[in-house]
Regions:
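C-terminal helix-rich "cap/oligomerization" subdomain common to oxidoreductases
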Residues: 1-4, 67-69, 265-266, 292-294, ...
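Beta-loop-alpha module in the N-terminal Rossmann-like domain of NAD(P)-dependent dehydrogenases
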Residues: 50-110
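Contiguous beta-strand/loop segments that form the cofactor/metal-binding neighborhood of enzyme cores
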Residues: 183-266, 294, 301-315
Length: 347
């Protein structure tokens, strides 16, 4: 591989067009070489310096392509990852990594056999609000953490005609937002002892789950992840309570909105969260004190830079295969908990 890694992108829907293509194009050391899309004719008019294919075979057969990014509907993630690895490509899979632990294990084994890097796109590790929270927790500002609440709510009362909201395998909110919110909790607190989950379809006409509330059980700590589609007045993005005080963070990381608006990654204002978190403390007399916390800078390009370095053999993958397998198992066991209505222990 040259020092400029040539990347092929499979899928040019929301994930491919809004997230992956601009991030690849604005990460030093990466070049967008090829795109596979059913919209080939339209993309040929938009991209003059990128190869555009209607199917994956030419991309996988192209020796100039070093890595493949898979941004297709979820059910295609594992089969395409296996095909790309068999073709000798490094692979980055949009979340979720696969639909099951068995699929995920097959991909990991194939990557090991091919001596290729495989990782999963957990870009929200580089959200400004999460990086700020991580700093607060790691510095011990809140003392011993007792509760961590992570909300990612939306008000989308109308069911849309798209695969993410269909009853097709891999559809639904649990497989859409669950990987992000669970991964963040695993980054903060590690592997839990048990999970209790409630996953439901709440909107009229919903064909897949559009709500979840899951509790990760740790000794002396509960981490709660929650997402709904009928929430016009959202709770704080993060609310964390410990023996020395609380941390509250409203708003949401700006990078997705910036990408949707066409802001180039790295442009002035990129990743700058204008809503500061608050540390809240009360003294023995009950007097409440609040102070703002400076936000970290969010930058999804850090994920792609780490993936680039892993391909070049000078760094670790941004999400290890062990982490990818753990998260897949947690998603499965969470579904088991919701289906059975009981708390499920984790070894």
């Amino acid at each position: 591989m040259t020092t400029i890694a040539q990347v092929g992108l499979i899928g040019y829907g929301l994930a491919g067009s809004v997230f992956h293509a601009p991030l690849i194009q604005h990460t030093p050391g990466l070049a967008l070489h090829s795109i596979v899309s059913s919209q080939r004719d339209r993309l040929l008019r938009s991209f003059t310096d990128v190869h555009v294919h209607a199917d994956v075979a030419p991309l996988l057969a192209d020796p100039a392509v070093d890595a493949v990014v898979i941004a297709t509907p979820n059910a295609q993630h594992a089969p395409l990852a296996l095909a790309a690895l068999q073709a000798g490509k490094h692979v980055l899979v949009d979340k979720p990594f696969a639909l099951s632990s068995a699929e995920a294990r097959a991909v990991v084994d194939a990557a090991r056999d091919a001596d290729r890097v495989v990782s999963v796109f957990q870009n929200r590790r580089f959200d400004a609000d999460f990086l700020s929270l991580r700093s607060v927790v790691e510095q011990g500002t809140l003392g011993r953490i007792a509760e961590c609440h992570s909300h990612f709510d939306r008000f989308r009362p109308q069911v849309r005609d798209r695969w993410r909201e269909s009853d097709a395998p891999g559809g639904g909110l649990w497989m859409d937002l669950g990987p992000h919110l669970l991964d963040q909790m695993l980054q903060l607190f590690g592997w839990p002892e048990a999970i209790s989950a409630d996953i439901a379809a709440q909107r009229e006409g919903a064909r897949s789950d559009d709500y979840f509330h899951a509790v990760l059980h740790y000794p002396g700590l509960r981490a709660i992840v929650h997402a709904g589609s009928l929430v016009a007045a959202s709770a704080p993005r993060f609310a964390v309570h410990g023996s020395l005080g609380s941390y509250l963070k409203d708003g949401r990381d700006v990078q997705e909105d910036q990408l949707r608006q066409g802001t180039a990654p790295g442009a002035p204002g990129w990743g700058l969260d204008p809503v500061h978190g608050q540390i809240v403390r009360a003294d023995a007399e009950g007097h409440v004190q609040r102070h703002s916390v400076d936000n970290a800078l969010g930058d999804y390009r850090r994920f792609y830079a780490a993936f680039r370095d892993a391909m070049l053999g000078v760094g670790d993958a941004p999400v290890s295969t062990e982490e990818a397998l753990q998260l897949m198992r947690l998603l499965e066991v969470g579904r088991e908990s919701a289906d059975s209505g009981r708390r499920v222990a984790l070894a």
